């Protein structure tokens, strides 16, 4: 696909209409299902999400097991989206990311782009400097990247006509414990439920409340 063709794939009105249509669904239809082709496209939207350096120090845990989701619900302020949405995605950040993660990424670049590893040495050193900063700074930096993926997921869902709800209202420590994340080297950051809005979700009728563009966007 050419750059011009890609730019014409989604018309401006289509994008704005989709963003106006979407909202943070508070009540899902428990029987609603996302078509397989749309879900596969949404998974691709996660894989293709941008990250700093392209490092991808994240993982996206799709939880379909109903029993497991029932265990997670009490750790989510008993919000019904956890059990009623067709899909539940837990966005994870890599714990203690370091030089080994950089090397893995460099190896992947070399493989995909057929570039000799030695030609990537400068890039590797730059990334290594970033991941060897104090651990709290590295974790904060990588956590911010996860929110980029969340935004990409939500926009993609809107364009596909798939309902979703981003959620920070959950006990991260409890999630990590229930899902056994720490032992696997991961930490939960944010979650997103996706599915079909319930016909009686009152929030669907609410008008969007946004400040005027003139107050939010400045051109200098």
List each language-model region with its residue ranges:
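Acidic, surface-exposed loops and disordered segments
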Residues: 1-220
């Amino acid at each position: 696909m050419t750059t011009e063709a890609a730019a014409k794939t989604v018309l401006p009105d289509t994008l704005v209409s989709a963003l106006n249509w979407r909202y943070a669904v508070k009540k899902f239809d428990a029987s609603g299902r996302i078509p397989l082709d749309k879900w596969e496209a949404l998974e691709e939207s996660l894989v293709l999400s941008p990250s700093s350096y392209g490092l991808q120090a994240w993982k996206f845990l799709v939880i379909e097991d109903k029993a497991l989701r029932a265990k997670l619900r009490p750790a989510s302020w008993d919000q019904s989206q956890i059990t009623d949405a067709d899909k539940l995605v837990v966005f994870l950040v890599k714990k203690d990311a370091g030089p080994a993660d950089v090397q893995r990424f460099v190896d992947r670049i070399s493989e995909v782009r057929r570039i000799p590893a030695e030609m990537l040495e400068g890039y590797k050193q730059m990334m290594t400097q970033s991941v060897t900063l104090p651990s709290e700074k590295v974790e904060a930096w990588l956590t911010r990247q996860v929110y980029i993926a969340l935004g990409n997921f939500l926009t993609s869902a809107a364009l596909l006509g798939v309902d979703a709800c981003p959620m920070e209202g959950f006990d991260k420590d409890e999630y990590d414990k229930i899902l056994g994340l720490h032992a696997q080297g991961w930490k939960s950051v944010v979650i997103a439920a996706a599915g079909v809005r319930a016909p009686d979700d009152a929030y669907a009728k609410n008008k969007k409340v946004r400040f005027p563009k003139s107050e939010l966007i400045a051109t200098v």
